[in-house]
């Protein structure tokens, strides 16, 4: 899956809370009613980031619908590469949030997808695409659809690590790990969720 970096930085004050500033705002229909919602990534004076979703009322005023405080990684948690946030987008009722970070020998990239469950009236994590790069050994990718349970893992050996002989090239290894229910967005912790690649016993975190 390709990562497209189209970040729009607004840096304007939120009228609802003078302690927060808006960093990125996107629009799209998230609940299937053909009316666009507003999705806003904000940051308070302490650097804590929040993802907020707004709906318009009958007076065309934006009212807060849902809010999440663990979906966007803070600016100082990206390692030597700096601010890890790269993109916020909405398409086909899905919110996508991209990050990358690391530094030196190791770098990482995350793309997570979230969708509103109209039946349960809650938000769930439905997809994760992860890439890890060890410049001296290998690059790994995992594309995981939490709705269907389908996961595709790839590993490409690179570099000159002394343990390079232990590295195995793996191309599009497909397996299924379907949770009983996709994780709730409100409880989700980016990079803290383990999945084990069967046959190879490799651990990945999304």
Annotate each language-model stretch with its function:
Residues 3-14:
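Sec-dependent N-terminal signal peptides
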Residues 20, 59-82, 127, 181-184, ...:
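Blade-edge motifs of beta-propeller repeat domains
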Residues 21-30, 82-93:
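Beta-propeller blade termini
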Residues 35-36, 48-50, 83, 106-111:
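Short, surface-exposed coil-to-beta transition loops
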Residues 44-47, 102-104:
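Short glycine/acidic-enriched loop and turn motifs that connect beta-strands
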Residues 48-67, 114-118:
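Beta-propeller blade repeat segments, especially FG-GAP/WD-type strand-to-loop junctions
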Residues 92-206:
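Acidic, small-residue rich beta-repeat scaffolds with periodic aromatic anchors
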């Amino acid at each position: 899956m390709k990562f497209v970096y189209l970040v729009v930085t607004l840096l304007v004050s939120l009228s609802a809370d003078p302690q927060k500033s808006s960093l990125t705002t996107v629009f799209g229909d998230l609940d299937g009613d053909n009316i666009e919602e507003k999705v806003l990534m904000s940051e308070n004076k302490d650097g804590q980031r929040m993802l907020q979703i707004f709906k318009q009322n009958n007076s065309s005023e934006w009212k807060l619908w849902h809010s999440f405080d663990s979906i966007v990684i803070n600016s100082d948690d990206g390692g030597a590469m700096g601010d890890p946030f790269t993109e916020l987008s909405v398409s086909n009722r899905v919110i996508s949030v991209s990050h990358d970070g690391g530094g030196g020998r190791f770098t990482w990239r995350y793309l997570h997808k979230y969708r509103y469950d109209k039946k349960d009236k809650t938000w769930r994590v439905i997809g994760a695409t992860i890439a890890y790069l060890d410049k001296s050994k290998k690059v790994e990718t995992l594309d995981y659809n939490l709705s269907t349970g389908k996961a595709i893992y790839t590993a490409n050996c690179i570099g000159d690590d002394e343990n390079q002989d232990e590295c195995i090239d793996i191309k599009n290894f497909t397996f299924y790990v379907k949770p009983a229910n996709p994780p709730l967005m409100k409880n989700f912790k980016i990079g803290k969720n383990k999945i084990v690649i069967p046959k190879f016993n490799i651990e990945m975190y999304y």
